[in-house]
Amino acid sequence: SSEFKSKIVIGTWSLSGDYGSVDLSKIQEVLLYCYEKGLREFDTAPSYGNGFMEFCLGSVFGNKSDVLINSKIGNSPFYGKSFIIGDLKKSFECTLKRLKRDNINILFLHNPRTEIHDYDSIHQFMDELKRDGKINFKGISLAKGYDYSSIDLNRFDVVQDDANLLSMDYKKLILSEKTLFMARSPLASGLLSGNIAPNTVFEKNDHRSFWLKGDRLISLMKRVDKIRGQSNLLLPIIARKFLLEDTQINRIIFGIKKKEHV
């Protein structure tokens, strides 16, 4: 339904090559297909494919005003993590160049943990970008498993975090009505897709090959089987339905790698 459609943001990490290689023409085809289907909001980051994903979005959509692009700062291609204002500025300028635009929708801090000691100067920098019309909203993308209780998340317009049937910590976040919550990883890196088994082995260039294996994979699959047993719907449908119906969630990032995922 259109009410649900407006909740959907297309995630581009899985297209970028970090989940196994994808070629350029295929990426362009998938992005245009999303656009044709009325999906106009995309989530990306400079580190996805080392700038490659932003470059692809720029070459497909350029400055199109009916496309919303959300990106991140704090983790740059080849350079790694830094939340020093000068580095954030540089990173954001490179993002605009790659995207071929003068404005983006939401700019997120990319999974900061202990690196930021002074959020005030960061807010000042992001508020300036808002005033200059370079970004519409400022956000923070939360790192998995890190405790943000000492930070006032309500100073941000948008908070992004993992939210799925295997990651329910987002329920503990206390956000004001003015702060939107954006869910990511709805299928828990594929664990809720129905395509992973306890003996699955991932390609070497797929980031999951590092952490999703052995006992960890087996114990997660036990939890997945439990979820599967509670309904006769297909697993990914159970997972998506749960998020779409959760009123605490304002937007959901669905990652795609091919047209069939749309």
Q: Where do the protein language model's features map onto the residues?
A:
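N-terminal binding-site loop/beta-alpha segment at the start of enzyme catalytic domains
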Residues: 1-68
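Acidic (Asp/Glu)-rich catalytic clusters
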Residues: 2-5, 36, 58-68, 96-102, ...
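Conserved, mostly hydrophobic/aromatic
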Residues: 10, 34, 42, 57, ...
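Active-site mouth loops of central-metabolism enzymes
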Residues: 13-25, 73-89, 115
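Short, acidic/polar
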Residues: 21-34, 83-100, 142-150, 239
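A short, structured active-site edge motif that brings together acidic residues
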Residues: 66-79, 107
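Active-site groove signature of glycoside hydrolases
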Residues: 96-117
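Beta/alpha (TIM)-barrel catalytic core signal, keyed to glycine-rich beta->alpha loops juxtaposed to Asp/Glu
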Residues: 112-261
